[in-house]
């Protein structure tokens, strides 16, 4: 069995790391490079940067942050936000990203997933799904930073992402985002069971038990969290030790 990954997520806007609840009400959490360096030292498996205003405000990609970060942080770096074409993917990879995450543009043009995967390799392509429950056992895909309901079924979209050649799915529950109530385990399990590629669970981590639940009950391959790490409640090392104590294989 592959070791399960713990991935701190940095939501970046205007060059600062922020954290909100249900995609609004943002609170400043610090300098992105400094924070990423701290996670590198704590033993994070990867770090994810999401430029959360890039798609909605048509802002260009945070290349300068990525370049500086890649010089100082030596774990895989995933970057998303404002990715609209294959050229954007290339620019991010050239700046030092290891993987590129796309969301809104992939929904608007699913061929982008296939084109990007074909040109740079599927291992570099992550497709993010922002999902919100609309009925029991049913979730819709939202775009533009969680502002636009596409009406698309999240499970069906996940299957299509898999078929188009993406390397993994970053699955965020908008209902749980920032609430500290734990992952939406039903959503996580439904998507994990529907696809062959790895699924990263995101949205709602409030304690270490939630991280373990994402793997054991949600069947996720990796778990992503922000505020529990940013504001010093837990270190990545503590999270890994807890998961190992629950019998989950992690890289210590």
Swiss-Prot record:
**One Gene Ontology MF term:** lyase activity
Q: SUPFAM superfamilies this protein is in?
A: Ribulose-phoshate binding barrel
Tell me the compartments it is located in: Cytoplasm
E.C. number(s) listed in UniProt: 4.3.2.10
Catalytic activity of the protein: 5-[(5-phospho-1-deoxy-D-ribulos-1-ylimino)methylamino]-1-(5-phospho-beta-D-ribosyl)imidazole-4-carboxamide + L-glutamine = D-erythro-1-(imidazol-4-yl)glycerol 3-phosphate + 5-amino-1-(5-phospho-beta-D-ribosyl)imidazole-4-carboxamide + L-glutamate + H(+)
Matches recorded under InterPro entries: Aldolase_TIM, His_biosynth, HisF, IGPS_HisA/HisF, RibuloseP-bd_barrel
CDD domains (UniProt xref): HisF
Output the Gene Ontology cellular-component terms: cytoplasm
* Principal location class: cytoplasm
EC top class, in one word?
lyase
Which pathway does it operate in? Amino-acid biosynthesis; L-histidine biosynthesis; L-histidine from 5-phospho-alpha-D-ribose 1-diphosphate: step 5/9
What positions does UniProt annotate as the active site of this protein?
11, 130
- Give the keywords, sorted: Amino-acid biosynthesis, Cytoplasm, Histidine biosynthesis, Lyase
Q: Name one GO biological process term.
A: L-histidine biosynthetic process
Q: Which residues form the signal peptide?
A: none
From what superkingdom does this record's organism come?
Answer: Bacteria
Return the similarity comment: Belongs to the HisA/HisF family.
Subunit info here reads: Heterodimer of HisH and HisF.
Q: Protein name, please?
A: Imidazole glycerol phosphate synthase subunit HisF
The gene name reads: hisF
